[in-house]
Amino acid sequence: MKLERKVRLCSAAAAILIAAIALTGCGGSTAASASTAASASTTVSAADNSCGEGVTWALADGTLTISGTGRMTNFTKDTPAPWADQADQITTVEVDGTVTSVGATAFKGCTALTTVNIADGVEYIEAGAFNGCTALTEVNIPQSVGYIKTGAFKDCTALTSVTIRDNCRLDMNVFPSTVEVNRAEG
């Protein structure tokens, strides 16, 4: 009886070990494992349309729409926006007014982006949010935006003018030096 139990236990342990080796790809092709991991990651990113707690994104016909309630995620070089691999397809960004912030580096490097519409209700734009959007020519910043952080529109070389509310706080180097910043009462 004890011997039979030990045999079953050893068999179960061997099965778990074999499954673990198969799942980690030990002894297999590294390129195949990396390719499989990249595909799984892409699938997860495409299926997960979250870009903040209660905030989602959708890309259709070149328009990236950010909607929901709350703050967008602040993205980084190590954790890029989930649409980063489609950045060259984005021509318009629409941010709904129930979203309270535009996340850091959210649209960085969207070189085909020409128009940004931020709805009234958004309170601030994080650092580097639109950095490197070299085709950007039109930005609609509502009166609700009270703070725009460093480099939010850095290297947006096609942008010539923007209008923001009079008491909107600007960090350093928010816009390229060639951009005319107009202040409106609000």
What are these regions (language model features)?
Residues 43-95:
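N-terminal segments that cap or nucleate solenoid repeat domains
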Residues 175-176:
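A structural signal for leucine-rich repeat
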Residues 3-13:
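Bacterial N-terminal signal peptides that target proteins for export
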Residues 9, 62-70, 87-101, 111-124, ...:
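Structural signature of tandem-repeat unit edges
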Residues 13-24:
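Bacterial N-terminal signal peptides
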Residues 22-47:
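Sec-dependent signal peptide cleavage junction
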